[in-house]
């Protein structure tokens, strides 16, 4: 399972080179090693990617037939790595599968990600930072559900295929913020008025 990647969109805008090194060159190095290893082993490579490769989905959900339209250096680096893996399947016949997952959330997630950042700010009675008007809609999946899907794909997936993984739970950033505030109020005392900053 290749879960290694630089993933923060804003950081990819500030320093795209790091994302190219990790997400493209790193995957190339992995593929070169796996190309030799797979000749002696019955292993398969599961390359974990993101639904960010599809760009902005204005309505509905993305599917495996959607064209790639990355809208950040992060998304572009993941799209490039997906194509690189796919090319190694076709050219060198390596046993690999590509997955594109929606936004994960769960325990021990990096604090710069949206849900942990919002929870931290709620707990510390700080304003909740929301980009634009908070209408950006994303699909969210609990990390354990993502892992279960990866295991199914590992066991039953078809070599060379792309599989989207999601939850069917689309929420915009404003909805996520309000939901977290409501849940927090049920569990413990939070500040009287938590501000949402746009």
Residue ranges of model-derived segments:
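N-terminal Rossmann-like NAD(P)+-binding domain of SDR-like oxidoreductases, especially those catalyzing
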Residues: 1-104, 124, 144, 173, ...
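Residue-level signature of the cytosolic catalytic core of signaling kinases
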Residues: 107-111, 169
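C-terminal substrate-binding subdomain of Rossmann-fold SDR/epimerase-dehydratase oxidoreductases
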Residues: 116, 122-198
